[in-house]
């Protein structure tokens, strides 16, 4: 067979160059698309949303603190969503597809459990951690000196489906005091209180609440004392507002009794083998070991009340959070002999515990426990 060695024509050369250029462009495009696709997948896999509150509430600064401390580029990102507060936040976590986490008060969870308004939420909503106690502020006009005097008068319960609305309804119902409910934002309610249209306003928010810090005694308003009574004791805690909390409304040394409810970080109860579960578990692994960072300036002072081991009675904790706490408990109870064995275990893996993140050390300790159990069975 003979081989044709005739020179290639100039048009054919141009055609070959063009085809080669197309192939190179296609390859570059595929590589570029793969890189963009990988970055997009990584960003989506490691981003969580947390629904908070309006700027007047405490939930929003608490959620923004999570974002400020935990954001780690594409590895973990916290998107803060403005919300209406506890009641609506529970609905959003329960039903909205794009919401991973929410901040809500325990008494609003109890409200939905009692009413069945959201169906059976016992197996749908889990809590990750109790964060702090949320004070319920009762602010009244000067002629109102007791909560009983609000009977039959207009009282603002904040926005519809807010945590304040549900808390205020619950408290007045339990006390047997029937009032006329209004649903304005706190600032609007204060303006209507000045004209006498509204007698009082309620706000459930961790102290010091910005919307109330702006109020002065010169405006004619004052805190209405609401001590803890027998009808409230199962779902509320006694607390005190002080001059240090609200210098504009309370004189030095002056205090006002009120009630509070526990606030928790909640999530939907995703099955363990789902991506949404994995995402929340990753958040827990980042959040729990760094709680001490949240309890320092400039973070919200309410973080100083947080205790990861605190329970929310009657509610199930997210399994990934429960596992983390169980592991930490086991680590804290390690004997000196076991600590030496663990060090040997780490040395065998050529690892230095101090150089690893806490979540990785905890994972390795679990592996160590399994290793020791396997040795004991031999």
Task: Name these PLM-found stretches.
Residues 188, 205-219, 223, 269, ...:
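An extracytoplasmic/periplasmic, membrane-proximal ligand-sensing/linker region
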Residues 1-13:
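N-terminal secretory signal peptides that target proteins for export/translocation
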Residues 67-68, 79-120, 188-192, 208-216:
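Pocket-flanking alpha-helical
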Residues 45-70, 78, 134-191, 195:
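Bilobed "Venus flytrap"/periplasmic-binding protein-like clamshell domains
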Residues 160-171, 238-313:
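Ligand-binding clefts/hinges and TM-proximal coupling segments of bilobed small-molecule sensing domains
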Residues 16-27:
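Bacterial N-terminal signal peptides
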Residues 35-103:
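N-terminal (or domain-start) structured segment
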Residues 106-107, 116, 177-275:
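Pocket-lining segment of extracytoplasmic ligand-binding domains
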